[in-house]
Design a protein with these regions (language model features):
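Transmembrane helix-bundle core of multi-pass membrane transporters
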Residues: 88, 112, 116-179, 205-208, ...
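Transmembrane alpha-helical segments in multi-pass inner-membrane proteins
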Residues: 217, 228, 232-294
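Single transmembrane alpha-helix segments in multi-pass membrane proteins
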Residues: 2-6, 20-73, 107-114, 245-262, ...
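Hydrophobic core segments of alpha-helical transmembrane domains in multi-pass membrane transport
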Residues: 1-4, 41-42, 94-98, 124-130, ...
Length: 325
């Protein structure tokens, strides 16, 4: 509503050169990689976990994708002609690395029994350094029109990143609703001990969700590097873990595990992107955006805490007792 008031044409969509354009389409495109990561984060949080390494995993995937395009050469910074490396090879390399990162986190958490925030903190720090090692600390450019289309291209007039985000949502929705995985995730996050006694291999469930968020992060890294036609390992996916967590909690998923909502996460991601877009168009310094996002996370966590729920329950019980008196 704020955007609509100050920019009356915010929701207008036009067709130019066969493409859908407008502020709304740009918002959906920019929200796509954040939504993809947030969907994976939803499943992780549903198992009572957390992953703060998603930005670094995106950086690793993006760096390896560009490095594959360049044939592993970082000795020159400018592009040297159009690359002919097959797109499928680029994607396989990037997503395989991202999946391995997720597997690493999953093993540390499920097998080694390290706390999720500590386990993913390891890769958050080391992963960013690893991505910078891949690129030699440089911003690597490339020329590969097919790969670039994943970030700036369109299918049937709609930006490709939107298709990728919708496809990711549908795939995760199908996996969690048409297979037992969704129920296993909820039972693992709701009561891991009871779930384990009932025969659920909670270790495998946790490893699966961390591999899934690794793949989501890798796909986001591909979109990021395809969008700007370069790889800057120091900034790919920077702070996106905060945005993903915020989208999940705004969407109604409980940080205590168990209950989750993929549809709610979609709404949360769009709200976050709208907020970012609004602040940028109003020339608000980026540091205030980060402060606001962190504040919302803290407030939501407080509201979801057992102490607040206990106080709310007691207050509701007193009101009911008075009404019956």
């Amino acid at each position: 509503l704020f955007n609509l008031y100050f920019t009356p044409g915010f929701f207008e969509i036009e067709i130019k050169d066969g493409r859908l354009t407008g502020s709304l389409m740009d918002l959906l495109k920019r929200a796509s990689p954040r939504l993809i990561i947030a969907l994976g984060m939803t499943l992780v949080i549903a198992t009572e976990g957390i992953d703060i390494s998603v930005g670094s995993i995106a950086a690793i995937a993006g760096a390896l994708a560009v490095l594959t395009i360049r044939g592993g050469d970082i000795t020159y910074l400018a592009t040297q002609g159009t690359s002919t490396v097959p797109l499928i090879l680029i994607i396989v390399v990037a997503l395989s690395a991202a999946a391995l990162c997720g597997l690493f986190n999953g093993i540390l958490i499920a097998i080694v029994k390290i706390q999720p925030i500590i386990a993913t903190l390891i890769l958050m720090v080391a992963g960013r350094g690893l991505a910078m090692l891949f690129t030699g600390g440089y911003v690597l450019n490339y020329d590969h029109p097919t790969y670039e289309s994943l970030g700036v291209g369109d299918w049937f007039g709609v930006p490709v990143p939107i298709f990728l985000a919708v496809g990711t949502f549908l795939l995760i929705w199908l996996v969690t609703t048409r297979t037992p995985l969704g129920l296993l995730i909820q039972s693992t996050g709701g009561n891991e001990t009871a779930s384990r006694y009932s025969g659920t291999n909670t270790k495998v469930v946790k490893i699966i969700v961390y591999v899934m968020i690794g793949l989501c992060s890798g796909l986001a890294g591909i979109i990021f590097t395809a969008d700007v036609q370069s790889a800057d390992a120091a900034f790919i996916g920077l702070w996106i873990e905060l945005e993903a967590i915020l989208a999940v909690v705004i969407g109604g998923t409980a940080m205590t595990g168990g209950r989750y909502s993929l549809a709610g996460t979609v709404v949360g991601a769009l709200i976050i992107q709208t907020l970012i877009t609004t602040l940028l168009t109003r020339a608000v310094p980026v540091q205030y955006t980060l402060i606001f996002q962190a504040s919302v996370v803290v407030i939501v966590l407080i509201l979801q805490s057992s102490k607040v729920k206990e106080l709310a329950f007691k207050r509701r019980a007193k009101k009911e007792a008075r009404s019956h008196a």
